[in-house]
């Protein structure tokens, strides 16, 4: 995981970074599933369960789970295709549509089952991968800023003047310090896409203009806001004024049944003698403000009929640099560190997660693997030549085998000891022949007596020694016979 994160940090391409982050999250997810499966198999083997016997129940259980969890299987398949086809990555601004769901936001995590996004209101939404039928990615490779805005034709000489003024305002917006680094292509102007006649008395004719420019991925909203602001600033007098049927510009609209405006100071003699407290306070505040800033007071007198004209370019720049929800939703690809920074309210959760640095499931997995490894080390069987104790978890079985061997070999030696005594008492040829017959009889009868006894290595060795003892006197007997027969054969 650290190698992947280092590669993500050193990657220069934003798309590569997003894809690597997505694959890293899914890789950890799959590794945990495989590790838990191997842990379960190892535990079953340690407790003596037969995996061959569990194959049939596992097949039946998997079939039942597959029928009951079809949606989960569909989510896993959809997640696999999302990752392999690189439909979107971590940090992309996407919009999901389908099955009655329309939600958009920044992708913060992708797993095999679901995708987590954070909306512009900082709400975390979890969407199963198979639920969203249509996915619209606004941050793939590059984007295009599209501004469609109606422009009044009242203050311009002709349509060419309207097009020139609006295009000049748009180019000023694209040349700003914050906007220029995000521009990738040339400005494309579509003039007079629509003409809107006045619908009520006093409204001017409007011509709709469309401006298009290629920008970096995810920054189209920033460029669009800057273009609209600059166009409004250029046509401020036309937007902020009202017209009459004769075309004369006036400061405010005259609407029928308009309620009379109440003056702050009553001009009656009684009111002049005893002014109201609210009116006096208002007059005092106005006087104080006029004394503090004379220039602002002059500007307010000039624009008294239209207070909206007090907004100048400084106010517009402040609005442009104000809070931008789309930019705040843009993720930060820089990694804050190797360990996690999760917060858990319970004490046992903090202990299992090592203070929020790792997942609790990872801690449990490592603990179980350590416990199984400890039991495996304690149950290691020594070699056959090992003389010391094997441990209480692996008792030795050599003692019981030695006892049974000594008990079974003892009865075999009894009939073999009687064979040499008969051989020593035969001095003649006739007795030698009888002795050979007698000696051959016990040799063949010895295995018959030991039929009820289990054969061992010691019994076999003793039978071989018995046969050798019986054969040695038999060899000497013919020598003695030849010596005794030689004198008798002469006459």
Curated annotation (Swiss-Prot):
Region (Disordered): 266-332, 384-491
Domain of life: Bacteria
Subcellular location: Cell membrane
KW Methyltransferase (keyword) present: no
GO cellular component: plasma membrane
Residues passing through the membrane, by range: 21-43
Chain intervals with Acidic residues compositional bias: 313-326
Comp. bias intervals (Low complexity): 279-291, 394-431, 462-473
Polar residues bias spans: 384-393, 432-449, 481-491
PANTHER family: MODERATE CONDUCTANCE MECHANOSENSITIVE CHANNEL YBIO
Name recorded for this polypeptide: Uncharacterized protein Cgl1270/cg1434
Organism this protein belongs to: Corynebacterium glutamicum (strain ATCC 13032 / DSM 20300 / JCM 1318 / BCRC 11384 / CCUG 27702 / LMG 3730 / NBRC 12168 / NCIMB 10025 / NRRL B-2784 / 534)
